[in-house]
A protein has these predicted regions:
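Active-site-adjacent helix-turn-beta-strand microarchitecture at beta-sheet edges
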Residues: 1-55, 148-156, 160-163, 182
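Short acidic (Asp/Glu) and glycine-rich catalytic loops that position anionic groups and cofactors
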Residues: 22-27, 59-65, 115-123
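Hard-cation-handling environments
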Residues: 29, 35-111
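Feature captures C-terminal
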Residues: 7, 79-201
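Glycine- and other small-residue-rich loops at beta-strand/loop junctions that grip anionic moieties
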Residues: 2, 70, 74, 129
């Protein structure tokens, strides 16, 4: 359970007369550094990694601040990703899927290919560049926000808010759909509903 399987979920059931009379649930922390690694599994992992080890350990950069993907809206590694999408794709705005995973890096840590891959390892790895009007951008963001914040749990799709680069906005999660986002700005100017923007994702 939890991020990177840091816990075991433990549920104790009190069963009486064929029915659950009571239950208790708790998270049991796993202190991986105190558990001896399984030799067979260690060997298997090393064998599988060996052909890719040099590439995975290639250092791309060194962190200046803590890099993470943990927030519901944005993390510092998310910012690196959307900034890169804007720069590489020549976009005005970038969207990146909202996730809370990957290894957090502390200031001074190397950013290796492996660390980058565990931040971006998803099933739809291609990046795109599309043209979207300001109106469409707001509609997309409103739709995603509704998947998260709809008051009816049957309409909530889970996940996190899409990560956004280049665009600033305010959000009121309790507002109705179509009214959650406001003050959308690109480079300090209001997003123009009628203008077409280049959007990387």
């Amino acid at each position: 359970s939890g991020s990177n399987a840091k816990f075991l979920s433990v549920m104790d059931l009190d069963v009486r007369d064929g029915r659950v009379a009571d239950y208790q649930y708790r998270l049991l922390p796993i202190f991986a550094n105190l558990l001896p690694p399984d030799p067979q599994m260690t060997s298997l992992i090393e064998t599988v990694r060996e052909p890719f080890k040099q590439q995975l350990e290639t250092e791309l950069a060194t962190t200046e601040t803590t890099l993470y993907r943990r927030g519901n809206f944005m993390g510092s590694f998310d910012q690196v990703i959307v900034d890169a999408l804007i720069e590489v794709r020549g976009a005005d705005i970038a969207f990146s899927p909202g996730f809370r995973w990957g290894t957090s890096l502390l200031p001074g840590d190397p950013i290796t290919v492996e660390r980058l891959m565990d931040q971006t390892g998803i099933t739809y790895p291609k990046s795109t560049l599309n043209e979207m009007t300001g109106e469409m951008i707001k509609l997309v963001l409103e739709d995603i926000a509704d998947n998260l914040f709809n008051p009816d749990p049957y309409y909530q799709m889970g996940g996190d808010m899409v990560r956004v680069g280049g665009l600033r906005y305010a959000i009121d999660p309790g507002a109705p759909i179509g009214e959650r986002l406001s003050d959308l700005e690109l480079n300090g100017k209001p997003l123009d509903p009628g203008r077409t923007y280049k959007v990387a994702g």
